[in-house]
Each structure stands twice: as structure tokens, then as C-alpha cells.
Amino acid sequence: MTLDSYDKLLGTVLQEYKILTEYKRLQSEDLGGIYVIPSHENSFVWFGVLFVRSGPYKNGVFRFTLTLPDKFPNDSAVPTVVFQSETFHPLVCPYNGTLELSEAFAKWKSGENHLWQVLKFIQYVFAHFEEYMAVAELTANNVAHELFQQSRADFLQRVEECVRLSQAKVYDPAPVQDRNYIVFEQFDGAVHGPVLESMKQGRANEVGTTPPSSGLSWVKEGVFQPLSKQG
């Protein structure tokens, strides 16, 4: 093995380690309702699903793909988030499903920015939609933005259709051949019942024990900085 080949291999191993570190770091963050896993074939592609728990998009189940730049994390290019089904949202491009991230991440800063912040941002712009729109300056879907500003009832009707569409596609076949693609199955009592009961029992045992709050919000009031600590 030549010195150049060795350096290239070492660089690849270190990069993969950094990506794995980013993934493991998700476990320490409050990311309820959003799930991601790196592709088995390509660690630069992550499959994700967002379950919206509040706001006008409540009960929506939105699949997305998170793609990392080739030189991540030592690259000023920001990761790309693309929703797989039609998602009527002012920040989602109606043509290719790309989420507008530049207002939160103008450029990627290694050591300061992390993928959990991107996932938090995704959560925030759906679950806290109106709060975000009150301060948002950029848009990726002018029709959605104008409808939200000028005809709230019509906007909400379009959002409801979007939510129903997302639910209808939950059980669609995987669009890619990847063992890590997140797949959902219809509930089968014989198969899933015991697991459900086990989960219920575990939750019952946790009653009365409240974990400490992380005190995190996506933005601190008056400061457009991802995940500032609240005082």
C-alpha cells in the first residue's frame, strides 16, 4: 500500500467515525417523534420519518432523506433534507421536496453544527409552525407562504390534505433496496401484541419518575441560533 493510499484510507475511516459519532449523539438529545438511520449501503444517506405531534401538521407522517456532503463534516456545505411525498409547507420546495435550511444554517461549521440540530429544526418548523413563521424570512414554496398569509382557512385545508396523503403512504413499498430503510407494517395482534404489552408495562413502571428537562428550544428569543439553552 502506498503512502497516498494509506492516507486516503485513514481519512475515510476517520470520516466514517465522525458520522457514526453524530448518529450516536442523537441518543442524548430530545428527539421524540423523529427517527433516522444511516443507509446500509451509504453512510452519507440517512433515512428519516417525522411524526408530527402538534400544530397544523399534527398526525402527519413524513418520510425524508438526509444527505451529507462528500467532505462532511469538514465542509461548509449544509446537509440536504428532501421529503419523499408531496409536503405542502412554505419551507419545502414543491418541485423536489427539498427543505429550506439556509436561514438556520447559512453554512456548515464543523464542531459547532451537528446533525441533531438539523433534526431539531425539522421538528420545530412542523410542530411549532406558526411560531417559526412569525420570524421566518425565507421561503421555498411561495404558494404555501402566500396562502398562509392571505387565506388561513385555505392553507389549513391544503395542509390537511397533505397530512392525509402522508398517512396513506406509510405502508408503501420501499423505493430503494436497502436493509436499513424504515418500513412499517399493519398491526398484527399475534405478532405485535406482546411487544405492545411489554411497552405498556415498561411505561407503567416509569410513572412517578420524571426525567430532568434539557431546557432546550430550537431558538432563543431574539437570537437565531440553533438550540440555544434557555435561561
Curated annotation (Swiss-Prot):
Residues 14-168 form the UBC core domain. SMART domains: UBCc. InterPro entries: Ub_conjugating_enzyme, UBQ-conjugat_E2_core, UBQ-conjugating_enzyme/RWD. It comes from the Eukaryota. CDD domains: UEV_AKTIP (cd23814). Belongs to the ubiquitin-conjugating enzyme family. FTS subfamily. PANTHER family: UBIQUITIN-CONJUGATING ENZYME E2. This is Protein crossbronx homolog.
